[in-house]
Amino acid sequence: MSTEEPQADEEDEDLQYFVRIGQTDLDGTKSVERALTDMNGIGRRVARIIAEKAEVDRRDVLGALDEEKIDDVVAAVEEYGDEVPEWLTNHQKDFFTGETTHEIGNDLQMSRRQDINRMKKIDAYRGVRHKRGQKVRGQRTKSTGRTEGTIGVNVEAIKEEQAEDGGDEE
């Protein structure tokens, strides 16, 4: 056997397979950028910014980082909303508080659900569309977004039904 294989095993021992950040278990075998995108509210652009703020190479494997670097990443995730411009956040001008925040994980899901429920309650146009289960953002609905499995009109079946109905009456 070669001497390289034990070194690979030693690297695997140092690797954390799950890294917990903000109520989310992240895959430690992925790069920092890719692992952070598994969190709700963090996309590729935000993940790059967080990696820069934490002074970590975005291509490094997340589970191979030492505890200090992981703590830096956690701190960068928590402080992200305070350090970036307003247009880079995901929850701008909250209805009740007027604050601009960047929400992550369950907080983001709850705030979106509350916003939709408020729109439904006051019967705003978007709220009515949400109630009816229709498209909200102005997409066409005549031909796209159909939920039924039927395709077109079967003219022959309609003619047969009319012939049967007409034959019974005579």
Curated annotation (Swiss-Prot):
It holds the Pfam family Ribosomal_S13. GO terms for biological process: translation. SUPFAM superfamilies: S13-like H2TH domain. GO terms for molecular function: rRNA binding; structural constituent of ribosome. Residues 128-140 have a biased composition (Basic residues). Signal peptide: none annotated. The keyword rRNA-binding applies. InterPro entries: Rbsml_uS13_C (IPR027437), Ribosomal_uS13 (IPR001892), Ribosomal_uS13-like_H2TH (IPR010979), Ribosomal_uS13_archaeal (IPR019977), Ribosomal_uS13_CS (IPR018269). The keyword Acyltransferase does not apply. Residues 128-170 are annotated as: Disordered. It comes from the Archaea. Keywords: Ribonucleoprotein, Ribosomal protein, RNA-binding, rRNA-binding. Located at the top of the head of the 30S subunit, it contacts several helices of the 16S rRNA. In the 70S ribosome it contacts the 23S rRNA (bridge B1a) and protein L5 of the 50S subunit (bridge B1b), connecting the 2 subunits; these bridges are implicated in subunit movement. Belongs to the universal ribosomal protein uS13 family. NCBIfam families: PRK04053.1 (NF003140), uS13_arch (TIGR03629). Part of the 30S ribosomal subunit. Forms a loose heterodimer with protein S19. Forms two bridges to the 50S subunit in the 70S ribosome. This is Small ribosomal subunit protein uS13. The lineage of its organism: Archaea, Methanobacteriati, Methanobacteriota, Stenosarchaea group, Halobacteria.
